[in-house]
Amino acid sequence: MPYLEPYLKKRIDSKLQQLQSLRPLSYASVVKLKEQFRIEMTYNSNAIEGNKLTLKETFLVINEGLTIKGKSLKDHLEAKDHYEALNYLYEFVEKDSLHTVSEVFLRNLQQLVVRETDPDWAGRYRIGDVIITGSDHIPPDANSVPYLMNDLIKWVRNNKRKMHSIELAAIFHHRIVFIHPFFDGNGRTARLAMNLILMQKGYPLVVMLKNDRKRYYDSLVKADRGDYLPFIRFTAQAVERSLNMYLKTLLPESKTKEKYYPLSEISNKTPYSEKYLNLLIRQGKIEAHKEKRNWLTSIEAVERYIKGRMRRRKIPTKT
């Protein structure tokens, strides 16, 4: 049975509660954060699939309508399409925060994701078999796709109150890419659709980073084999990153005292090497977030891990 590790669950639940306690949130701050996340997710989700636009170029294409020299038309169209799909997601949640996941919602999302790059198959399930380049996974026969998608939606509805929303969202994400219901846009659609479940529970938009692409795909492969824990952990850490960014912006300065540093600096001030800190972070045991390719954490986060470890071993702390 997949599960969210207790220490990670406790940390995330606490941060979500902290964010909820700040409501009503500053309108100006939320608008700014949402726009930042829209651009960031559009860039990262497309880049995971091979889009060549940089983060800055993605911003310029969407907000300034610029054409980037040396980048393909497809790269430009994918950025615009994904941004529109994100707008649809936000509007969907804001219009009815309790709306249940449905096949219509998924098909509408995918239709927007590939509207300009694959218009003939936008919003339609595939009718032929497909091979995923670079993957050993062979998606189910095309004839079974409608039945599998119907079963998936029923599964989500049946488990909505039985599972933690992060577990539910992660497994839902995996099942979409496993079934591969569309000819194109499956990964981007799955990353968007997962967010419906999370945003309905009050989480900010969750972005899976291009720099974590290998870990993302490795954990999906393990989920293909029935081991969901790595992908649930990966998803949870992405959730925590979004919560951290919101809290950092919205909390009063006096309540955000922790400063985050690269692991090379933290290792000089704590008992652990940079390599071991990296391992603990990847396991979700120490709170951290990524900036570009580097993990950042705080001395306080390491100290909390040490104290928790001592309590579990029933070793008294110094007074």
Label each region the model flagged.
Residues 1-184, 188-319:
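FIC/Doc superfamily catalytic core
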